[in-house]
């Protein structure tokens, strides 16, 4: 009999928690829907934000919106201290999301512009890198042994890097052959043709 009584006593608290959760989700959903139309005006603003002048005004604008939400929240869980604590962290998140959403949208727009610029640079890069490759100067890429495919490494590497790549490939090939010999029951017998095929794959 005590268990049903405890459940009945906890039922209002559970209902309040559920109501708070639903309200928080609706606020987040509304905040996610509202920045989409507002994303067009902030796009011209990022160059102005680079100066730093408008940046403080934007985070301050949603804060007054937090004060109307503040009195509503404490009124609901006033009698429940435990539920008030989760509502407290949830409360700043609701108003914080509208402030964070435009900022995140602006950051994403800036990142997208940077990626587009890099793509444009990448498209222009190969045409300008052609003469540099012939001279052997100015062309650079991040070298990581064993990661290049086909004959890429022959065209792009210095002599030292080419030797390192071939050394790594030989180590990989030796590991493959050892694995195949150690696991004959899994892979079967290795013929000379198999060895030649592997050597051809590694261009050796």
Curated annotation (Swiss-Prot):
Record's compositionally biased regions (Basic and acidic residues): 110-126
Keywords (A to Z) from UniProt: Membrane, Phosphoprotein, Transmembrane, Transmembrane helix
InterPro entries for this protein: Mxra7
GO cellular component: collagen-containing extracellular matrix; endoplasmic reticulum; membrane
Biased composition (Pro residues): 38-47
Membrane topology, as annotated: Single-pass membrane protein
UniProt region (Disordered), positions on chain: 32-148
Stretches with biased composition (Low complexity): 63-103
Keyword Phosphoprotein part of the UniProt annotation: yes
Transmembrane segments: 7-27
Modified residues annotated as Phosphoserine in this record: 191
Name under which the protein is recorded: Matrix-remodeling-associated protein 7
Organism: Homo sapiens
Gene name per UniProt: MXRA7
